[in-house]
Curated annotation (Swiss-Prot):
ATP binds at residues 35, 471, 508. This is Phosphoribosylformylglycinamidine synthase subunit PurL. SUPFAM superfamilies: PurM C-terminal domain-like, PurM N-terminal domain-like. It is found in: Cytoplasm. Mg(2+) 2 binds at residues 100, 252. GO terms for biological process: 'de novo' IMP biosynthetic process. Belongs to the FGAMS family. Monomer. Part of the FGAM synthase complex composed of 1 PurL, 1 PurQ and 2 PurS subunits. GO terms for cellular component: cytoplasm. One of its GO terms (molecular function) is ATP binding. Part of the phosphoribosylformylglycinamidine synthase complex involved in the purines biosynthetic pathway. Catalyzes the ATP-dependent conversion of formylglycinamide ribonucleotide (FGAR) and glutamine to yield formylglycinamidine ribonucleotide (FGAM) and glutamate. The FGAM synthase complex is composed of three subunits. PurQ produces an ammonia molecule by converting glutamine to glutamate. PurL transfers the ammonia molecule to FGAR to form FGAM in an ATP-dependent manner. Its EC number is 6.3.5.3.
Amino acid sequence: MFPHEEKLIREKLGREPNDLEKAMLEVMWSEHVSYKSSRKWLKLLPTKNEHVILGPGEDAGIIKFDDKTWIVIGIESHNHPSAVEPYGGAATGVGGIVRDILCMGARPIALLDPIRFGPLEKEKNRYLFEYVVKGIADYGNRIGVPTVGGETEFDESLDNYTLVNVACIGIMRPEHLVHSYVTEPGLKLVIVGNRTGRDGIHGVTFASEELGENAEEEDRSAVQIPDPFTEKLLIEATLEAVYTGKVKALKDLGGGGLTCAASEMVGKRGFGAIIYADKVPLREPGMTPLEVMISESQERMLFAIKPEDVEELGKIFEKYELEWSVVGEVIEEPKFIVYWKGRKVAELPIELLTNVPTIEWPMKEYRIEEDVETPQISLEEAFEKVWRSPNVISKRWVWEQYDHEVQGRTVIKPGFDSAVLKINEEYGLAITADGNPTHCYLNPYHGAMGVVVEVVRNLVSVGAKPLALVDNLNFASPERPEVYWSFVETIKGLADAAKAFGLAYVSGNVSFYNEVVNKPVKPTPVVAGVGKVKLEKIPRGPREGDLIGLIGETRKELGGSELYRVLGVSKGIAPRVDLEVEKRNAESVLKLIEEGLVSFVHDVSRGGVAVALAELSTWFNVGIKSEITTSLLPLDFAFSESHGRYIVTFPEENLEAVKKIAPITLLGRIGGEKFELKINGEKVSKTVKWLSDVHWNELYRIMD
């Protein structure tokens, strides 16, 4: 909390808050809980379209899939905890977002994990990578929710740090919707799940400041302890309770613990609460009311239930061997009152906890884009360097640790442009997540637009019509004028791109203060998207003899590219997005898929056309012969990361029909046992065996 905020609190209260009140206010006024630096700007994002049932404002967003099925989606970051204790930090990040989905009344059916680390040459970064993945794998596998996609990226700005974002998707029937707020007084507040311990105390205040040099030792107690077995029981018990229709409001005890869950639950509609803190089941002896109220122990839910229904729902919790206790009640008066063993120990106006004033930090525009010379290097050598890049090689080492098929819904597995989950016999849900901090660092506005259009292309590539988005905004300290400016520019880019496609953001997360010892991360907006796809229309893969075509224009756009990264070039101009072209090309590709004219579609993004073609070769173990004549230099055509492009494969007899729908540049043909790419006479020639060995096995070798 800042000094001017403490002064404001004293003025509003007319007195000095006691230690417990101060601790609760610190939690609620933290950046992590209050969004005080971002709230004003988040209003620029579109939040409504014909698919949206519930937009931002609760624990997760809801989209209509059909009349009987709603899709619930949310995204969270667990960056600081994962940097300090990677296993526990990542695992509890999964647990938290799963409970956010659960408390809307939905069954969690899938996870996505966009995760980022420093260069793998360093042992500390390999350690963070290994244990973040292990934390996500162990927790997701044990609760029976498949991790079906995500992205893994390595960047020098993340040295000794990690960005761990987790998205969760749930499915529900409309009649099971439960809100996170109460609409009447007199309800009992019931805590269910794990006992409360001292773990995670000050977790949200720790997440609202930069990490110091000794964070690993000093901040470990702020990281919560994961318990996936209790979470699994909590999922089943909560859903059974929800299906009775007797749960009036439901919140997960996440950041800010009981203080945050209870005050937000009652305060949204202007009610208050009495909390009997001594009734909270404790894991450790001698805990104080302050520790109880702000502990962030995991696997706990807060239910609002009518007094006459408490015993009935209590029996459900007991059936799953979950501890439960009535810890408070909803009152008409807008006050938040805490008792401890019969003694009143805190009393605050509810508004003081839930209505935190916004802060606008100074902004300073930065311009670092400049045209640069591409270093002299042969096409073959450049290809080898890019193809071996940890950002390009397969992340099978990651997703092989995840059970991505539990629940039996996974139609398209990890590693492709989007995962697809079967929702009913006819339709599936496509899900994907993307970010590009290198582009966003060069130009936050165009970089952010680029993230959105890549999400759209990834959904479209499997034949899905995009429905909605969620965003996770990872930034350094907003107190840095350049960072705050880049944050606002990012939101403008995210908004403009989504509006062009008629898409809405239904939920999201802002994570500031991502820096270690004065070293800020690059602007890293991550966007996850969902789309609806007809299962029988999904393109299943190229066949021998198929033609390969490129939809979309390739320009000389190497700024922020993977080629520049491996060559050590940090400047350049980020690729620009033409929203009209993106829309037109997306519509054309959907039509090609709908009419069954193409055998496969792949979005062109990181690594450009060269990488997209080589991925096609390795994914399906097919040879490719490609000969291209272009006005661009071979390196520019091969590795440009221009937006709006798709690789499509199709039988030769469909060529004329394809051309009628989309302007297409023929690149070559599927066949043989070699990958041959010739641009203006300059050649890359590799066996499919060599390509595949590097692609599938390189990360295992690095992590061995």
